[in-house]
Curated annotation (Swiss-Prot):
Membrane topology: Single-pass membrane protein
Role played: Interacts with target proteins during their translocation into the lumen of the endoplasmic reticulum. Protects unfolded target proteins against degradation during ER stress. May facilitate glycosylation of target proteins after termination of ER stress. May modulate the use of N-glycosylation sites on target proteins.
Protein's UniProt name: Stress-associated endoplasmic reticulum protein 1
PANTHER family in the record: STRESS ASSOCIATED ENDOPLASMIC RETICULUM PROTEIN SERP1/RAMP4 (PTHR15601), STRESS-ASSOCIATED ENDOPLASMIC RETICULUM PROTEIN 1 (PTHR15601:SF14)
Lineage: Eukaryota, Metazoa, Chordata, Craniata, Vertebrata
Extracellular side: 60-66
GO cellular component, one term: cytoplasmic microtubule
Annotated source species: Pongo abelii
Length: 66
């Protein structure tokens, strides 16, 4: 009897899963009114370091290549 009940519960859970297909729950993204988790200065520093190191690497490869 317990096995039949367990199978019935699994079938109900599965059928709920099928009928709700395509209904995606809301994401955990910030609402439009909330602030970003990274400040503008930290973002600017990160971009400066990444772009600066890329430019430095390009200049160094040009010097060594010629």
């Amino acid at each position: 009897m317990v096995a039949k009940q367990r199978i019935r519960m699994a079938n109900e859970k599965h059928s709920k899963n099928i009928t709700q297909r395509g209904n995606v729950a809301k994401t955990s993204r910030n609402a439009p009114g909330e602030k970003a988790s990274v400040g503008p200065w930290l973002l600017a520093l990160f971009i400066f370091v990444v772009c600066g190191s890329a430019i430095f690497q390009i200049i160094q490869s040009i010097r060594m290549g010629m």
